[in-house]
A protein has these predicted regions:
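Short, cationic low-complexity segments
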Residues: 39-62, 112-116
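Acidic/polar-rich alpha-helix caps and helix-coil junctions
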Residues: 1-37, 68-70, 75-230
Length: 230
């Protein structure tokens, strides 16, 4: 689980155990990016957010669907994010998120001058507010990484009808395990999730393929692949 941290997306040097190709920044060459500006400005970028329909697809820590919980539709923010897949915490501002201003860490809830939905992204944002105004970021941006290879492998085998429990364990199970999920890591699911079918993939009946699609959405969120996946 140590590999999948925010460090994967905010490190100056690519995390070589995961990243295969990256856009590498270098202050000495004046090669920087504008991730903080893009993801925090009320005027510069398109103010991209997650929506609740998608946030609902993040599993509970025990591997069960959040949408199986009674009352999930009306939960307040602080309740709905409890005990979820840790990638949610690494993707949006939650109650424990802090930023650095003048060397001091301060709580940083979602800012509604930016976010329309309350689910404000942090995936590529450096914590210091210094980086917010202009192209100041020096973090490298992963372009191809091992997780995508695992997901492509899993999906190809599932589409061919030859996806096994062993395949599940070394692909989807491995990705979920490093994100802090404890259940359902060694065997394929046997029941199709009706929430995924109703909201995203009505044409899919295979439980394994449905879960692979869930995993692609969560693992690769904001990495530029969602439109093609859908």
């Amino acid at each position: 689980s140590d590999v999948y941290k925010r460090q994967l997306f905010i490190s100056v040097k690519p995390v070589t155990t995961e990243v295969m190709l990256a856009a590498v920044c270098d202050k000495s060459l004046s090669v920087l990016n504008d991730a903080n500006w893009y993801w925090t400005s009320a005027t510069y970028g398109p103010r991209l957010n997650l929506i609740r329909t998608f946030v609902n697809t993040y599993l509970m820590e025990d591997g069960t669907p959040f949408t199986d919980k009674e009352g999930y539709k009306t939960m307040v923010f602080m309740d709905e994010v409890k005990n979820r897949d840790k990638r949610l915490q690494q993707t949006i501002r939650m109650g424990d998120y802090k930023r650095i201003d003048g060397g001091v860490q301060t709580p940083a809830p979602p800012i509604f001058s930016y976010t329309y939905t309350g689910y404000q992204p942090i995936k590529y944002c450096l914590d210091d507010v210094f980086y917010d105004s202009g192209a100041n970021n020096d973090n490298s941006i992963p372009l191809i990484r091992f997780a995508e290879v695992l997901l492509n492998y899993a999906e190809a085998k599932a589409e061919l009808g030859v996806f096994t429990d062993a395949d599940w364990e070394k692909t989807i199970g491995a990705l979920r395990g490093r994100a802090g999920i404890t259940g359902g890591l060694t065997a394929r699911p046997t029941k199709a999730d009706p929430y995924l079918q109703a909201n995203y993939f009505p044409e899919i009946t295979d439980p394994s393929l449905l879960e692979i699609r869930r995993e692609r959405g969560i693992e690769l969120v904001f990495e530029g692949l969602r439109f093609s996946d859908l």
